[in-house]
Swiss-Prot record:
Positions bearing carbohydrate: N140, N203, N277
Localization terms from the record: Golgi apparatus membrane
Protein name from the UniProt record: Probable xyloglucan galactosyltransferase GT19
Pfam families linked to this entry: Exostosin_GT47
A GO molecular function held by the record: glycosyltransferase activity
GO biological process terms held by the UniProt record: protein glycosylation
Keyword Amino-acid biosynthesis part of the UniProt annotation: no
Length: 435
């Protein structure tokens, strides 16, 4: 049963959506000659609340997962890290669907007429809805995930869906795409739901936190960090702090794992850091922030300060290739060190252009470290200081592209494209190229 605070939060959301947002959307009259919105109109499909707002009441229903209720605050950004901050929140990436929904309501080219739209946004909280299939009573019915949505799309104004066979539809799924890729024919069911395996959804675009090795429907977008500035001065103030921060440590690993005896990249990192710290008494070469058991998930203070003090942030794959810490590190101006392309280079092509990776990151193949004796320390120390400075500046330049600014931001900050803006641009380009 939802807590009292959750019910209060939901009441605020209902008030916001039905008494504030709806008139704003309808007041945006369409002009066929509006050059700024040519090929950029988006229609937000009106879905029954069971597909979005009602799902928020399940925020504490699954004991095996974290209680998401506290992180519904501030339209999904979570509670502030402290009362006086204007930019830092305890954000849970699983609420990206809610964050994106709130932000797209500010998109300047919304149209109430689906026939004029280049893209149709489905405000369906697929990741939150998937919890009942992953951890709840519908565990053995995971192949049904999406059937209710499909039935609605094909029965309520079916011409919107059928006009382009779903090619112009997109949604956000705040989990790795693997979690929605269980084959429909597997019996007994394995991990995940079958949403992306449904033939009817093959044409839509899904914005996920991580894509598969052979993405067709999905495109990975950055994990939300805890940094959500609301004005340009706050962003510029943070960038100044990042630039003047003293980088007293060569490299940092913030994460868990690596404690098993079997060879893997996280174990190699831990062993190298332990060895370095045992022999170095003056210069700090390797810093380690233990984030085991999820203790860092909603506490950015644990890792942001060490990231600000490090030149390089190690980003080894874990249970899945991608890491939220990649984007935490970029926000801190910490140069990412990758050990396989699937961690970022092959994932976030809209936000981190593949052709520019060498300008702001270092790649060391994990096989070289685990099996061939390559020391990470040696590779990083061989990079000239001037090159490190230049790379850090490129990381800082990338910062706005991977951050999610706060809803209701100032016009000055809105002129800088953030992760949502770039995702929308990518979706529109993708749809236009396909239809």
């Amino acid at each position: 049963m939802a807590s009292k605070s959750t019910v209060t939060t939901l009441t605020i959301f209902f008030f916001f959506f039905f008494f504030f947002i709806e008139p704003k959307v309808q007041s945006q009259q369409i002009s066929a000659v509006d050059s700024e919105c040519t090929n950029r109109w988006i229609h937000i499909r009106t879905l029954p609340s069971r597909f979005n707002l009602d799902l928020l009441s399940t925020c504490n229903r699954y004991p095996i997962t974290d209680d998401l209720c506290p992180y519904l605050a501030n339209h999904g950004l979570g509670p502030k890290t402290h009362t006086r901050t204007r930019s830092w929140y305890r954000t849970d990436p699983l609420l990206l669907e809610l964050i994106f929904h709130r932000r797209i309501l500010e998109y300047p080219c919304l149209t109430p007429d689906p026939n004029l739209a280049s893209a149709i946004y489905l405000p369906y909280y697929a990741g939150i809805d998937s919890l009942r299939y992953l951890y709840g009573p519908d565990l053995n019915s995971s192949a049904d995930h999406g059937s209710d949505l499909l039935e609605f799309l094909t029965r309520d104004q079916p011409e919107i869906w059928s006009r382009r066979s779903g090619h112009d539809h997109f949604l956000v799924m705040a989990r790795p795409a693997w979690d929605f890729s269980q084959p429909l024919t597997v019996d007994p069911p394995i991990w995940g739901t079958s949403f992306l395996e449904r033939r009817e959804f093959f044409n839509l675009t899904a914005l996920t936190l991580e894509s598969r090795y052979w993405p067709w429907q999905e495109q990975a977008v950055p994990y939300p960090t805890s940094f959500h500035p609301h004005s340009l001065p706050f962003l510029e103030s943070w960038i100044r702090r990042v630039r003047r921060s003293r980088r007293t440590s060569l490299m940092l690993f913030a994460g868990g794992g690596g404690t098993s005896s079997s060879p893997n990249i996280r174990r190699s990192i831990r062993l190298e850091c332990t060895s370095i710290n045992a022999t170095q008494s003056d210069n700090k070469i390797c810093d380690f922030v233990d984030c085991s058991n999820g203790i860092c998930e909603h506490d950015p203070i644990r890792f942001m300060r060490p990231m600000l003090q490090s030149s390089f942030c190690l980003q080894p794959p874990g249970d899945t290739p991608t890491r939220k810490a990649t984007f935490d590190g970029i926000i801190a101006g910490c140069i990412p060190v990758f050990f396989e392309d699937q961690t970022a280079k092959m994932q976030y092509k809209w936000h981190l252009p593949e052709s520019e990776f060498a300008e702001f990151s270092v790649t060391i193949p994990k096989e070289d470290v685990v099996f061939r004796g390559v020391r990470i320390q040696d590779v990083l120390m061989s990079i000239p200081k001037e090159e490190v400075t230049r790379m850090r500046e490129r990381v800082i330049e990338m910062m706005p592209r991977v951050m999610y600014r706060r809803h209701g931001a100032s016009m000055g900050l809105m002129n800088k494209k953030d992760a949502v803006d770039i995702a929308i641009d990518g979706v529109l380009d993708r749809i236009i190229s396909r239809v």
